[in-house]
Design a protein with these regions (language model features):
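Membrane-interface extramembranous regions
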Residues: 2-144
C-alpha cells in the first residue's frame, strides 16, 4: 500500500510540475504573440507609412476635428505600441505591458466601432486584447 501512495504522490508532483511548465510556456507564448503583433503594426504599418495606415489615421484625425495631425497620431501610436511590446518582453514588466495593451486595445476597438468601421484591424485588436486579458488573469496571483 505504501508504494502505491508514493507512486500516486510522485505522479501528482510530476503532473503539477508539468502543469506549471505548461502555464509558463503559455504565458511566454502570449507575451511573444502580443509583442510581435504590436511590433509588426508599429514598424511595418505605422512607421513605414503604409497607405492603409495613413488613411486610417487621417480618418481618425478628422474625427477629432484635426486636433492631432495624422503623422503625429500615427507615429505616436507606433511609439506607444513599441514601448508596450518591449514591456511585455521583459518578465518583470510584462504585467504592466499587458495592462497597457488592454487599455490601448480598448481605445483601438472603440475607435473602430465609432469611427473606422470593422475589418481585419478590428479583429486583430480584439485578439490582442483577449490575449492580454488572459495573460493578466493567469498571472494575477503572482502580483500579490
Amino acid at each position: 500500500m505504501s508504494t502505491t501512495i508514493r507512486e500516486a504522490l510522485a505522479c501528482s508532483r510530476w503532473s503539477r510540475g508539468q502543469d506549471f511548465m505548461g502555464k509558463r510556456l503559455a504565458l511566454l507564448a502570449i507575451r511573444l504573440l502580443v509583442s510581435v503583433n504590436l511590433l509588426y503594426a508599429a514598424i511595418f504599418l505605422k512607421f513605414a507609412g503604409v497607405t492603409d495606415s495613413v488613411a486610417l489615421f487621417t480618418q481618425m484625425s478628422q474625427a477629432v476635428h484635426g486636433l492631432v495631425s495624422q503623422p503625429v497620431f500615427r507615429l505616436g501610436s507606433g511609439a506607444f505600441e513599441t514601448v508596450v511590446a518591449v514591456l511585455l518582453l521583459i518578465p518583470k514588466t510584462a504585467r504592466l505591458g499587458a495592462g497597457l495593451a488592454v487599455v490601448w486595445m480598448t481605445a483601438v476597438i472603440l475607435s473602430h466601432i465609432f469611427v473606422l468601421g470593422y475589418g481585419w484591424y478590428f479583429v486583430d485588436a480584439l485578439m490582442v486584447m483577449l490575449l492580454a486579458v488572459i495573460y493578466l488573469l493567469l498571472t494575477r496571483r503572482q502580483s500579490h
